Amino acid sequence: MSYIIDRRLNAKKKSTVNRQRFLKRYRKHIKKAVTDAISRRSITDLEHGEEIHIPAEDMKESFFHHGQGGHAKRVLPGNQDFIGGDRIERPPSGGAGGSGSGASDSGKGEDEFVFQITQAEFLDFMFDELALPNMIKRQLLGSDEFKLHQAGFSNQGSPGQVDVVRSLKSAHARRIALTLSKRKKLKALEKQLHLLVAKEPVLKNQVEIEQLREKISTLKSRVKRVPWLDDFDLKYHLRAKEPAPQAKAVMFCIMDVSGSMNQATKEIAKRFFILLYLFIQRNYQRTEIVFIRHHTVAMEVDEQEFFYSRETGGTIVSSALKLMQQIIEQRYPLGDWNIYAAQASDGDNWNNDSAVCKEILCKALLPKLQYFSYIEITPNAHQLLWHSYQQVKANFPDTFAMEQVVDAAEIYTVFREIFHKQVI
């Protein structure tokens, strides 16, 4: 009797691979369910997964079968009504069809397949195919991430790392070194034996010939006893770890908290930034987040104050952009950091300030930034700030994005549009 001992690390989750394969197969249905769930839920309500419904017809697997109609010969095992040679009448046209609408006292069907995805799987599908654009600046950081590279060869290693060619060369060299003297002596004895055998029968010394043959046999056996391949011959690829260059990024979150931003508009802005915060924290380990709130004066605040402070005032958008410029110059060298910014506002701004915002973005900020995104939360006609930003987008189409949000249901769609993964 044979025994199978399961030493897998995921012993309590033996179906993990099958589950991953299942999620991959029904990816389209799951992504649609996640998108619908986000439109129903609050962005902060992400403490649980989601129930996924898959229609029964989508669960069926493809298979080959005979189509209806035509002529075919078939063998029906276990038939008690017919014998070979009997002719079976063709059913009347449409006889194989259903009865259409109406109730039935027979038949069966299948319900939808329902299963639950975890919170981690929900977030994976939620942020699937999203990325911070243009993250190209990389450097060596003090991290535990490494990449392996070829660093020569070693006499020890795992069987999978054996260099076959180098091992065979080493074995061949060892055999030559260990048998060289014996082969030379063997060659000399064989030559001497050949000379003795070639003499006239009267002059042959049979005793000497037998002695030579015995010596030759002994030497050959000694040569054969040298192993063809020894543990000493095995050479293994040596792979060494070296620190991998890591991308380092900072995201500036700029939110308008002026008096023109009513409570509903502020809630939409907060939801957008909560979604951005979750996205960065989940997908990028080495990304710092700088929170800036502004009315007439801009302030750098912590996460708690950014989302929950009730301070308000007038509107000067350029104050936030100027503060962002100062922080970059003081703390984030351009050669080391990928710099991003996301701004949310209702579009209301002091009239003369929109031109100042355009100048700061075009001359001071965007040449240093990897990406700047702006969302305007308003159901009304756009104001001067939007039109000024349109001119900025015309000059920087690859690094500047702007979208309008009317209500909370559009947040996730706009977020995916801004941060969709770019194919290079």
UniProtKB/Swiss-Prot annotation:
Cystine residue pairs: none
InterPro entries recorded: UPF0229 (IPR006698)
One Pfam family named in its UniProt record: DUF444
Renumbered residue ranges of the record's region Disordered: 77-108
Family to which this protein belongs: Belongs to the UPF0229 family.
Descriptive protein name: UPF0229 protein Ping_2705
